[in-house]
Amino acid sequence: MTRKIVDLARSCGILYLMLFIGEWIAHHLNIGIPASIWGLLLLFLGLTFRIIKLDWVLCSASLLIRYMALLFVPVSVGVIKYADVLFSQMNVLLLPNIVSTFLTLIVVGLLSDYLFSLSSFSHLRKKVARKQAEKA
């Protein structure tokens, strides 16, 4: 039990440290990127370059993920509270969302078509087609 408490404290401490450093960066750079994004970027880089071990943050990260739905309740209430502002700005909000969705679909479709046309994928497709032909 004591070990779990120590792991949770260390895990929360690391996450808060990343957030604190993100706050410092956001305050001093002042380029419009929120401190939480800086903190997440630092956490990602720390995990990627193995400066921070996954086991060190796993305890509090899994706890936060478990209760993530509860963390979104205040945001949802805020959206409902300011629904009139959202509806008045709907044309500004809706157009970029629709355009970015279609652009994402097009780029992913073209990229997947290109990747499947490569020789390694076409070789695998031919192999699967032969196996299906043998079964029939």
From Swiss-Prot:
Compartments it resides in: Cell inner membrane
GO cellular component: plasma membrane
Keywords for this protein: Cell inner membrane, Cell membrane, Membrane, Transmembrane, Transmembrane helix
Principal subcellular localisation of the protein: membrane
Superkingdom assignment: Bacteria
Family, as annotated: Belongs to the UPF0299 family.
UniProt name for this protein: UPF0299 membrane protein PM0880
